[in-house]
């Protein structure tokens, strides 16, 4: 009988921290010389680590001020609006608090399951995500918007930004799918608002979460450098 591979691992065990470090070493090695600023690479490598696919690197786009805007917003304890409860569950409160101790779970909002949102969606036959983001105006104005699911919601926040209704601190635009996805991202990156997107149809909640966590890492590192 062939020995299970777990025995080889147990013969030379690695902790979770060691495995993560080794993973990032592999990502850095395969990437070669950096062609983007170090802070942007911190975000991209975290995304690669999340999905295991280095080919996504050229698809990630940053507005010129995206990293600094995101770091500043996190340090100030800006509220977050997320377009799915999966993102809300995936965000680490401990990581957010490592940047700003004032963060609480109540500062991460998702309205897709709100009864009034569901009722309006049923009445109009429009997606819940559309009404959910409209309900979040107060959070979005000055807050961090994290989209990993709903392109229609991103289209609506794009409209609100373009028409001067809100001015988010940062918009992370990673909706995934085939309908209204690519154009929602292209429109976002053209707007005068700090943003991070992933071109094309790919994206998703886990990648959106990884961007927030990477920004927390950047914020911690720069605090140590300047502290």
Task: Describe these PLM feature segments.
Residues 120, 126-184:
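Long, charge-patterned amphipathic alpha-helical coiled-coil/hairpin "stalk" segments used as oligomerization
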Residues 169, 179-227:
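C-terminal functional extensions of proteins
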